[in-house]
C-alpha cells in the first residue's frame, strides 16, 4: 500500500483551441482548490488494485483504509501481508488510536506488516502502481475531490 498527496487545480481561463483540430492550450495560471490524499492498495498476483481519495492523510485515515481492506475486501482471510513504506502513520498503533481496543486488536492481529527499506521505495509495488496511475489518469488538472474520486474509480475499473 502507498499514498500520495494530490493538489486539486482548476483552470483560471478556459483552455483555447488555437486552430480547429489542434490540442487545446492550457494557461500556465491555475486556481488552487486544495489538497487531498490518494491511497492505493495492490495485490500484484491477483492483478487487483483499490484506490480511494481522502481529505487528509492522518493516522485515522490510514486506520480507516486498513479497516476497509480487512473487513470489506478480505473479510475471509486470517492474515494479510502488508508491504509499505515506514511513514509515521503506518503503524498498528494508529489502529488503537482510531478504534476501540477490541476492534483495533482484531484488526492488528490480522496484519503482517513489512516495511520497505529507506531508499528502497522501488520495492513497493503500490508506489509503482501510483506512478502508472499518475501517468494514465492524473495527466490533467482536476479541481474537485468528487471528480477526482470518480476518475480514479474509472481507472481502477479499467485496470482491474
Cite the ranges covered by each PLM segment:
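RNase H-like polynucleotidyl transferase catalytic core
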Residues: 25-30, 103-125, 141-144
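Active-site proximal helix-loop segment of RNase H-like, two-metal nucleases, encompassing DDE(D)
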Residues: 118, 126-145, 158-160
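Acidic/histidine-rich, metal-coordinating catalytic segments
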Residues: 77-91
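Short, basic/hydrophobic alpha-helical segments
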Residues: 60-81
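Short, aromatic/basic amphipathic alpha-helical patches
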Residues: 94-104
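Short catalytic/ligand-binding loop motif for oxyanion handling, primarily in non-cytosolic enzymes
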Residues: 7-9, 89-92, 122-125
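Extended, low-complexity cationic-aromatic segments
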Residues: 1-67
Amino acid at each position: 500500500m502507498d499514498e500520495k498527496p494530490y493538489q486539486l487545480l482548476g483552470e483560471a481561463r478556459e483552455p483555447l483551441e488555437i486552430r480547429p483540430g489542434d490540442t487545446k492550450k492550457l494557461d500556465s495560471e491555475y486556481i488552487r482548490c486544495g489538497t487531498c490524499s490518494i491511497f492505493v492498495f495492490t495485490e500484484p498476483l491477483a492483478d487487483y488494485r483499490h484506490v480511494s481519495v481522502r481529505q487528509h492523510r492522518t493516522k485515522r485515515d490510514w486506520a480507516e483504509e486498513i479497516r476497509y481492506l480487512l473487513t470489506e475486501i478480505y473479510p475471509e482471510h486470517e492474515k494479510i501481508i502488508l508491504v509499505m513504506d515506514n511513514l509515521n502513520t503506518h503503524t498498528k498503533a494508529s489502529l488503537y488510536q482510531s478504534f476501540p481496543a477490541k476492534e483495533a486488536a482484531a484488526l492488528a492481529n490480522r496484519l503482517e506488516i513489512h516495511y520497505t527499506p529507506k531508499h528502497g521505495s522501488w520495492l513497493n509495488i503500490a508506489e509503482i502502481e501510483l506512478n502508472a496511475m499518475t501517468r494514465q489518469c492524473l495527466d490533467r488538472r482536476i479541481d474537485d475531490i468528487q471528480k477526482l474520486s470518480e476518475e480514479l474509480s474509472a481507472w481502477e475499473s479499467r485496470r482491474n
